[in-house]
């Protein structure tokens, strides 16, 4: 009984993140993912996926790249995501810090800096709305860093079933790596 009351109370404040997810939930660098709040299923369950389109194998320093996060999951009523770009070279003094800038190009995506100093791109309230029950995408721009080593992108996305509870939502994570151009 107490557990049910605690879960019911959590749904009104902790779990509902229509404006933005809490920073630091991409699943990368030891961070939790959306699964820490959206309970009931394993990460990457039931054949869905989240991918990042537009990440180059090799980036040119300072270049602007259009990127898109794509979530595919059946029966998605609402959805959200969080992405970060961080230095990945363990020998690099910048390891784990933000690499470049993720910039909004529309009202569906914005960014927030966490207490750890890392920048996170994520959905807005407008970005929760799906036009298809099987997929949703969010577009933004990544400005490649001017210095440093390889960059790893971590993304987590939540396929919500629309019942205003944290239960039975589906969470997906993925990552992509990009290396500096040899030019």
Features from the language model and the residues they span:
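Sec-dependent signal peptide recognition
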Residues: 1-2
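Sequence context surrounding c-type heme c attachment/ligation sites in exported
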Residues: 5-183
